[in-house]
Structures are given as C-alpha cells and as structure tokens.
Amino acid sequence: EDTLTARDLLSVSIISADTHALIKSFFEAYSCISNNIYVHEGVGDINVKTIRAMVEAFAKKHQKTPVVIIDYIQILAPYQSKTVTDKQNMDKSVLELKRLARDLNAVIIGVSSLNRMSYNDAITMSAFKESGAIEYSADVLIGLQLAGVGGDKFNVEQAKQENPRKIEVKVLKNRNGPVLPSYLMYYYPADNLFVDVLEKPNALPLAQLFDPLQQQELPF
C-alpha cells in the first residue's frame, strides 16, 4: 500500500498532485474516526488524579466510559510528594489506575518502558520499569521484543537494522484467560507500521488473541 512517512512530508518542498491526493485520502479516512479520539498532550504535571478527573468528566458528559490509553506511564507526574522514591510513586500511580478501571468499569491501556537490563534478554513480567505494581495489578500484560532475543547468536544492533524488523508479541499475563502462544509480526520503523506474519504454525491473527468467541479454536 502507498505510505508516506513524516520524513517524506518534511523533505518535500513541492508536493506533487499524486502525493497531495494521497494525503487528502489519509485525512478523509481519519475523519471517519477522529470524532471518537481525544488526545491530551503530556504538557505540565499530568498525573493519575488529572486523568481520573478527565475520564469522569467525559463519562458524565457523554454517558459512556472511554478507552484510556496512556503513553507512557513512567512519565506521569508524581502522584504523591516528590520526597518518596520513583518506584513508590509509580506503584501508587498504577494502583490508582487499577482503581479507576474498577470504579468506572473502564478499559485502561498503559504503555510501559522496560528496564535496560532486559534489552538483550527475553521479556518477562519483571522487565517493566520501576514498578512491581504493573506485574501484580494488570489484568493483561503484553510484551514486544525483537524476535530471537536472548539467543546465543542474537545481536540487538543487527536486529534493529533489519527492515522490516521481526517483532515477537508475547502475552505474559492474562488474568481471565489462557496465556497464548507468541505471535510474530513485521515492524516497519519508517511508517511505524506493524504487519501480521503467519510464519509460525500456531500463530493467530492478532485480533483473535483476546476474542472470547475464538477461545474454543485456540491451537492447544
């Protein structure tokens, strides 16, 4: 499919008619869903209290609870006094997000960074940075890692130079269901695009990973 990267747009002094038409088609496609997307830039001291106030105001106004995506949780402002440690603040923030999800029956997706010691090893639940509360509080934990990481011949720099990169999706925790097999995807960095790769015999389409209607068809 035709794609344009941010670099493409910034490096073109005069946009051709074909490129202009392509950009227009992108905006038209986005306009179909844009009314359902609200973006709050992380400018200023946004913490879990701020997020809770936003979600409660939205739910009251629209009579429905939004899906909340936090990118990413390690840069949230401290929940409590700055005299406590980063880990204590992060644990408190994660626990309050869990409470928000429970109180409003909301879906909250939090993006997390990993500790640097995990870059060359297979991802585990302990890899999530600065917080054991992530491991214990989350209903579902999904990790992304370069395929082959942790192997004797794995070279992280070489793997990052590949285009596309092979990315393995690992379900580390699924509180209310089975932990499914790893899933392989291609990642195109220039386009920030993930593409399904059905190379493994037991791989599932990503949309089926947590579809309860597909549970009886899982390959185990």
Predicted features along the sequence, with ranges:
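Conserved beta-strand scaffold positions in the cores of enzyme catalytic domains, especially
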Residues: 38-39, 141
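Conserved H-loop
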Residues: 110-113
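Catalytic P-loop NTPase motifs of RecA-like helicase/translocase cores
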Residues: 76-77, 144
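Hydrophobic alpha-helical membrane-association signature
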Residues: 51, 89-96
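Short, conserved active-site loop motifs that form the nucleotide-linked donor/cofactor pocket
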Residues: 35-37, 106
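C-terminal regions of RecA-like/P-loop NTPase motor modules
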Residues: 2-10, 14-17, 24-32, 49-68, ...
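Functional beta-strand-loop-alpha-helix junction segments that form "active/interaction loops"
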Residues: 41-50
